[in-house]
């Protein structure tokens, strides 16, 4: 049999009280039972024996009062009680700043107590849950407030508690995260309580009972009983007893404090269906609240964090993991790196790796080349055959390089002359300097064919020149000393210039014999 608080509609109460588990146990009220031919009621995929429609709020059974989920996570009872008191004080203070009715603040505190009898303070932040409870209570009591206002009020209370200068809350990523946490906590409260979140308060019951006792005109008695009832919201009496019993206990305590006599033959509370033992237990629980010290928020937060870390360590230890998430070595069957017969750290000095030998030989060759480059003969030793070959190769390269570089200043000089003469002289000088270029066959025909052959010779010489540049190996280019090459280039520049002048004079004389009339003008222009 499931029971729940006062529903908004009959259909909602039927579905809520039957489909979702309630935090309470047995309750009295109007009960309607519907039985099918199979002996139960099928709602969804679950079979229920009966559906109870009641206006009474749920009461937590005695077996769930101790141990609580927080105590099972390692939190002691005094710390849990202080956290409950502190959370209810936050809800009460925030409700005053939000200008909520007292009924809404009372509903939020009752929801706070109910939730933490199902969940642990170690796993859930009591401040976030307090925000969610007061936000949910404002909706239940038809006085809704925005989540932004709730967060701002709790931020202000936190600053006052820390004795800091009040400052507005910055709307940054932390605010967005807090807002999302409050929304998720509100859903969690609804789910955990089975959406049975309506609370029957004893506020109106107190006024009604005092009218029966003809004490409603005593405003001091009414206000004192009302105050005791509001203070008892910080305790767990609202989840343990019926609202009628709580109203009788508040009137009993106020009349004793003000020394106002009430009927005793028979006792007045027997008229309302309560017992003296329950009234005395509620009074003791309420008066104990005034003897407790004010809870320290910082110490409670540290205690909760400590228990949270211990719980996390216990979970990781049960899974065989370290604190950083890595697997523990003790769970790997006694594995130890030192237990191996031969460790890779132990390397014999006599043994040499073939890789290291190859590296040494590779490193030795550039050292020999560097030592050879420091010699006055361009790094060539006379007593080896390899050094002779490298010297001859370096000389031929230096000559070829100097010749190719010597064309650079002449190129600007030849631009002043005719284009055909420049191309022909340049192609012939380059073809003579490169031994790899093929021998030219002069065609003594028309000047157009000569120009065509001249362009072909220029292309072939350029192509062979590129091939020669690409064929040079990297090792030969490293052996050439830059300073010696520049000195040779300066020394031999005049010599090669003379050779080019002689070659051009020879060409002019050779052409003059065969083409005296056609090329004579160009020859005079060169001179």
Swiss-Prot record:
Ubiquitous with higher level in liver; expressed in striatal neurons. GO terms for biological process: regulation of RNA splicing; regulation of transcription by RNA polymerase II. It is found in: Nucleus speckle; Nucleus, Nucleoplasm. Keywords: Cyclin, Isopeptide bond, Nucleus, Phosphoprotein, Repeat, Transcription, Transcription regulation, Ubl conjugation. Gene3D superfamilies: Cyclin-like (1.10.472.10). There is a cross-link at residues 340, 348, 363 (Glycyl lysine isopeptide (Lys-Gly) (interchain with G-Cter in SUMO2)). The modification Phosphothreonine is found at residue 326. Pfam families: Cyclin_C, Cyclin_N. Residues 1-37, 327-527 are annotated as: Disordered. Residues 383-419, 439-453, 461-477, 487-499, 510-527 have a biased composition (Basic residues). Involved in pre-mRNA splicing. Functions in association with cyclin-dependent kinases (CDKs). May play a role in the regulation of RNA polymerase II (pol II). Inhibited by the CDK-specific inhibitor CDKN1A/p21. This is Cyclin-L1. It comes from Rattus norvegicus (Rat). The gene is Ccnl1.
């Amino acid at each position: 049999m499931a029971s729940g608080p006062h529903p908004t509609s009959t259909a909602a109460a039927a579905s809520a009280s039957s489909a979702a588990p309630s935090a309470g146990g047995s309750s009295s009220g109007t009960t309607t039972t519907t039985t099918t031919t199979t002996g139960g009621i099928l709602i969804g995929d679950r079979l229920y024996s009966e559906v109870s429609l009641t206006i009474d709020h749920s009461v937590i059974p005695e077996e769930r009062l101790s141990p609580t989920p927080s105590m099972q996570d390692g939190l002691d009872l005094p710390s849990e009680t202080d956290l409950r008191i502190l959370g209810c004080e936050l809800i009460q203070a925030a409700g005053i700043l939000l200008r909520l009715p007292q009924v809404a603040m009372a509903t939020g505190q009752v929801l706070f107590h109910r939730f933490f009898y199902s969940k642990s303070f170690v796993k859930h932040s009591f401040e976030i849950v307090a925000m969610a409870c007061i936000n949910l209570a404002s909706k239940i009591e038809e006085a809704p407030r925005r989540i932004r206002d709730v967060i701002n009020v709790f931020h202000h209370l936190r600053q006052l508690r820390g004795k800091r200068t009040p400052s507005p809350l910055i709307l940054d990523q932390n605010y967005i995260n807090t807002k999302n946490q409050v929304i998720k906590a509100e859903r969690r409260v609804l789910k955990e309580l089975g959406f049975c979140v309506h609370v029957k308060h004893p506020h109106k019951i107190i006024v009604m009972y005092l009218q029966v006792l003809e004490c409603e005109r005593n405003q001091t008695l009414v206000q004192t009983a009302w105050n005791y009832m509001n203070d008892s919201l910080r305790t767990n009496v609202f989840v343990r007893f019926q609202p009628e019993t709580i109203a009788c206990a508040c009137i009993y305590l106020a009349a004793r404090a003000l020394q106002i006599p009430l009927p005793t033959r028979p006792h007045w509370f027997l008229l309302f269906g309560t017992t003296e033992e329950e009234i005395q237990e509620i009074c003791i629980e309420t008066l104990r609240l005034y003897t407790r010290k004010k809870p320290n928020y910082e110490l409670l937060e540290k205690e909760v964090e400590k228990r949270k870390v211990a719980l996390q360590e216990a979970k990781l230890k049960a899974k065989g993991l370290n604190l950083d998430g890595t697997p523990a070595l003790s769970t790997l069957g006694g594995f130890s790196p030192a237990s191996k017969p031969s460790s890779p750290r132990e390397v014999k000095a006599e043994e040499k790796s073939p890789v290291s030998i190859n590296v040494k030989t590779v490193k030795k060759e550039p050292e020999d080349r560097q030592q050879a480059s420091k010699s006055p003969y361009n790094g060539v030793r006379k007593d080896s055959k390899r050094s002779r070959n490298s010297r001859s190769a370096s000389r031929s390269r230096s000559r070829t390089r100097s010749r190719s570089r010597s064309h650079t200043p002449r190129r600007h000089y030849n631009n002043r002359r005719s284009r055909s003469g420049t191309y022909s002289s340049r192609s012939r000088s380059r073809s003579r300097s490169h031994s790899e270029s093929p021998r030219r066959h002069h065609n003594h025909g028309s000047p157009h064919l000569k120009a065509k052959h001249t362009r072909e010779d220029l292309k072939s010489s350029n192509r062979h020149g590129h091939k020669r540049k690409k064929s040079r190996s990297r090792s030969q280019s490293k052996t050439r000393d830059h300073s010696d090459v520049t000195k040779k280039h300066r020394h031999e520049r005049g010599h090669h210039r003379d050779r080019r002048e002689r070659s051009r004079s020879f060409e002019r004389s050779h052409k003059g014999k065969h083409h005296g009339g056609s090329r004579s003008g160009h020859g005079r222009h060169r001179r």
